[in-house]
Swiss-Prot record:
GO terms for biological process: methylation. It is found in: Membrane. Its EC number is 2.1.1.-. Belongs to the class VI-like SAM-binding methyltransferase superfamily. Isoprenylcysteine carboxyl methyltransferase family. GO terms for molecular function: methyltransferase activity. The gene is ustE. This is Probable O-methyltransferase ustE. Glycans are attached at residues 22, 29, 205, 264. PROSITE patterns: S5A_REDUCTASE.
């Protein structure tokens, strides 16, 4: 394999929010991004628990689903949230995703955050989480509508969505940990990691992100919405993030013949998810 070399920003034609190869410190931009991730969790709580989400839906002429009974967990701080078990689990998934991003930024990531990247990625998460929960509250689109099974923990959309979410989030963490361990070894400096899941898929972390995002969408807005989110991120990664990363890696070090394995695996996952939901939910 050829030796790794530095790649100047001017050499890269693809657009990406991550300044590849720039490992300088960016405390202000990093703090801004993490602040937006924390704010996202509070916004989702307001949407799920108070009149914020209901007001938005009614403003646009929609109707909302009935609020399920508050969960009785035996823990005062949880019960004070006033959320049903379904809504509490949706909020929990949002918080877990944000916690994963905190962990990644503070312990794994090496590239500096740009101001644009911090704002765009932070607002992107707020947008999709807000869209999820507004569609959950809207009677016409909710995965918890009476037709879909109601706002109960036994709702098949919630159960299936949570499993998919957990698989995707854990897989993404495993990918990042494996790659981090590989990079910490001085003998691997400048080498691309091709072990673990990276030996099967060129970009397993992008695939895993798509998986957990689609699981969260499924639990909020049902199967059609969940599949739409999966297809959107497959398109976004295939046309933006993957070409940008591949270009950087190709210019930095010989990577071997390029393939589209990650995209194919994402499509395979989409088909598997569709079959799984059809089996347990019984409707599209």
């Amino acid at each position: 394999m050829a030796d790794a070399k530095a790649v100047a920003k001017a050499e890269l034609k693809s657009k990406d929010f991550v300044p590849r190869g720039n490992k300088s410190s960016s405390p202000l931009n990093t703090t801004l991004y993490l602040g937006l991730r924390a704010l996202d969790c509070y916004i989702q709580y307001l949407i799920l628990s108070r009149a914020t989400g209901s007001f938005i839906i009614k403003f646009f002429g929609g109707s909302i689903i009935p609020h399920g009974p508050p969960v009785e967990a035996g823990f005062m701080h949880i019960e004070k949230l006033g959320l049903s078990g379904y809504r509490l689990l949706l909020l929990f998934m949002d918080i877990l995703a944000a916690a994963k991003h905190f962990w990644f930024v503070l312990t794994v990531a090496e590239e500096a955050w740009t101001l644009t990247g911090a704002i765009v990625v932070g607002l992107d998460n707020i947008f999709f989480d807000t869209l999820n929960n507004l569609l959950f509250l809207c009677a016409a689109t909710s995965a918890a509508s009476s037709k879909a099974g109601g706002e109960t923990l036994a709702n098949p959309y919630l159960a299936t969505g949570f499993i998919i979410f957990a698989v995707g989030l854990v897989t993404e963490c495993v990918c990042e940990i494996d790659r981090k361990v590989f990079k910490k070894n001085p003998m691997n400096k400048g080498k691309p990691y091709t072990g673990g899941l990276f030996s099967l898929v060129r970009h397993p972390n992008y695939t895993a992100f798509t998986i957990w995002r689609s699981g969260l969408a499924l639990a909020s807005g049902g199967m059609i919405y969940g599949m739409s989110i999966a297809m959107f991120f497959m398109w976004d990664f295939s046309n933006r993030a993957v070409p940008a990363l591949d270009e950087y890696c190709t210019k930095r070090v010989s990577y071997g013949p390029r393939d589209s394995t990650s995209t194919n695996w994402s499509r395979i996952w989409l088909l598997m998810t569709s079959s799984l939901v059809r089996r347990y939910v019984g409707r599209v």
